[in-house]
Amino acid sequence: MIDAKTLRLVTQNGLQQFAQGFILDGIAALRTLLPYCAKEAIISVEAENLEKNYHYMLSFLRNGGSDEKRNDVQAKLQRQGVALLEQACRTIRISLDSDLYCNALNRLRDVYGGQDALLDKWNSLLTPEEAGDVQDDIFDLLWTSPFWTAEDTAFWYDFLMQQRDMVQQHLEGAIFLSLWEHYDAEKMQLLGLMAESDCRRTHITALCHLMLLRIRHKELVPLMPPLPKSILSRKEKKQIAQVQHELLLMLVSEKDMEKEMKEAEAITKELFSGKQPLNAQNIKDMISLRGRYLRNRLQRGLDINLSKIPLLHTCKYMRRVSHWFMPFDKTHPLFQSVMIDDKGREKENLSVLVDLIMDCDVDKLAMLYLVAHDKDFSKAVQQLDEQELPDNAGSVIPEYNLRFIMQDLYRFFGHSPLHAQLANPFREEVTLLDFPELATMFSIDDTVACSELLFELGHYKQVLAAIDDVISREGASASALLLKGRVMRERKKYAEAISCGRSAELLEPENLEVLHFLVECYAWLGRYEEELEYLQKLSDIMPDDKSLPRLIAATIDKVGRREEALDLFFKLDYEASPDDDGYDELTSSIADIALALDKLDIAERYTRKELDLSDGKKWEAHLRMGHIRLLRKHRTEAATPEVNTEVDFVKQKHPAEQNEDGNDWKDAIDSYEQFINCFVGQHVQEAGVAIAKFHESWGMLEGKGIKRADLLLIQDILQAAASGTLK
C-alpha cells in the first residue's frame, strides 16, 4: 500500500504536470495511483477515457487534422485530469484512515449514516447547544465531502442562503478547508458566489479564502474559475491588496514578538545568572519593554495577542476542527453561559470588556471557554462584574474585518489539530503580487505598502520584482523609488541607492523620508559635504526641529571645520536646558571637539558636566577625562626643563606626597580605571575588552605628542589593576 507521504508527492507532481500542460506526464502520475483505488471503478474508467481522448486528439493533429477549438479541448482535459487526480488521492487517503479527516468522515457515517439524516436533524427543533453540535457536524460533512457536481453546488448554495449570516460564515470555512486539502472547481464556484454576498462579513471572508486558495494551489490558477465580477470592481480590487497586506502583517507581528522575546530573555538571563539583582529597576525595565512593543503594535495594526496563543489554544474547546472557523457573536452558547446570569440578565461589565477586547474570534471563544470551565477564570470574571461599570463613551468597538480573519487563519494553520498535515500559507514565499493577473489589481500605493512589509521581512528580491513591475505599469512614485533605494542600500549598492533617492527627490523635493534617506546614504559613504547639503534642506523645511542643528554641527565637524562646529555647538548649548532630550549628547560633542582642538579646559568642563548628568555612569566620559588629564601631564612635562633622566620609582616620593600640579598622571590613571569599571559593569564584559577600547585612542593621543612607551605603561597598569596583581 502507498504511504501518505508518497501519496502527497505523486499527487502534487501530477497536478503540476496537468497545470503546466504536460498532459501525458499528468496521466502517468494518475496511473500510478489507480491500483490503490481500484474499488472506485468510476475513477479508473474516467482515467482511461481521458487518456484515450487525448491520444485521439494527438493522432488527429499528427495526421494533419485542424481544430480551432483544440486549445479549449486541451484546457478541458487538463481540468479533468486535475479532478481525477484529486479524487484518486482522496479515495486512497480515506483507505489509509490515518488522520483527523478520516476520523471525522467515519464518525459522520457511524452517527448519521448519510447526509440526509444529518440535514433532517438540523431542520428539527433543537436547543441552542444541540444546534451548535449539529452545526459542527455539518461543518465536518462539508469539509470531508467528495467532489461536487454542478447540482451539488446549487444545492449547497441554496442551503447556505437559508441560514443566518453567522452560520453561512462558519460553513463557508468548511468549504475553504475542503478546498485547501483537495482542489474542487465546483466548490470554488460556490466560494465565488459567497463572495458576492450582501453581508460584508460573509463577503470579505469568502474573498480572503479565494485569495489564499490561489497561493495554496498556485499551479492550478490558470484552470480555476474566473473571479466574480463584483470582486474585479474598482472598490473590491483594493480589498485584494488588503488581503495580502494583512497576511504580511501577521508575519511582521510574528517577527516583532520574537524580537520582544529576545530582549526580555536578555533581561531575565542576567537576573537568573545572578549578574543583576531583582529590583525595582529590573521590573520597570520589563514593564517598559512590554509597553514599548505594545504601543508599536497598536500603532501599526500588528497582532497584540500572539503571546497568549499557547495558553488559549490548548484548551479542550479547540480540539474540534470546526471551532477554529466559528464566528463569534453574543448568541453563541459560550457567550450565553458566561455572560448571562441566573436571572437571564447580561453581565454588563464583562459584556463591555468583550466588546472592546482586541481579539479575533478564535481567541475570544477560547477565552470564554476557559472562563466557563476554569475556576480561576470564573473567579476573576465574578470580581470584574462586581466592579463599577466602566464608562465606554467614545470607545471604538473593533469591526470584524480582514485583520481578524487573517489572525484567525494564522492561529488555525499554526496551532490547530490539523496544523502538522496542512500546507501553511504563512510559510509560503509566494504572494499575490507574484500572480500577474492579481498584481495588476494593486495600485502603486498598495504595492508599496505590501512591499514595505516584505522589506521588513528581508524578502528583497520580491520587493524589487514588485516595485519594478508596478513602475513599468503605472510610472514611478517617490515612495516606490525610495523603497527600491532602501533595498539597494541593504545590498550595499550605494550608488544605485543614491540614484533612486535623487530620482525620488525630483518627484517630491520636500519629501522628508527621501531627504533623510539621502542623508543616511551620504553619511554611510563618508560623503559629508553632500550629507551636510541635505541636512540643510531638512532644516529649511523643518526649522523647529531641534535635532537638526546638532546634526548639522556634527557634520560640519566631520568635514573638518571644527572651530565653526564648536561655535555652533556653543550656541546650541546656550539655547538648551539640561532637561532637554539629547542634552548629554550635546555636551559630549562639545567635549570631543574641544579635545580634538586641544582646548583642554573646555573639554574638561563639558566632560565633568557630562559625568554629572549621568551620575558618573557614562564610560565614554571617563575615558575622555583620562585623555584630558594625560595630555595635561604631557603639556606640563613639555614646559618643564628636563633635569634628571634617570628615574628610580622606588626612591621617588609617594604620589600623594607630590604637589598638586604633579597629579595629572595619577588622575589620568584614576579616570581610566573608572572607565574600565563603568564599561565592564554596563556591558558585562571582561576588562580586556575595555582596555581594547582604550587602545583605539592611541592614534589620537600619539598625534598629540603622547609617547607610545607611556601608553604601554598605562595599559600594563590597567591590566595589572584589573587582575588584582598590582599592590
PLM segments and residue spans:
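Single-residue signature of alpha-solenoid repeat helices
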Residues: 26, 463, 497, 531, ...
